[in-house]
């Protein structure tokens, strides 16, 4: 499994969350997508998204679509995309949580 970790600075965390809700169906329809997390510190406006992918190939194939979805999710709230990084997931402990 592989992950894409993106960090953000949001002046409107609620707007950012709504933006991510608006693109979630498109994300779920992407080949090789497993699941995702959005974490928000409402006080500081810092946020992070983690998307989990079945393989490195799926992660890399989704790069341009993920870029577009990230822009669509962040534009309405004027959120700044600070970084996007890719990681291998060599180990998982427990069961992924559902919100």
Task: Describe each model-derived feature in a short phrase.
Residues 1-48, 54-99:
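Short S/T/G/P-rich N-terminal loop/turn motif that feeds into the first structured element of a domain
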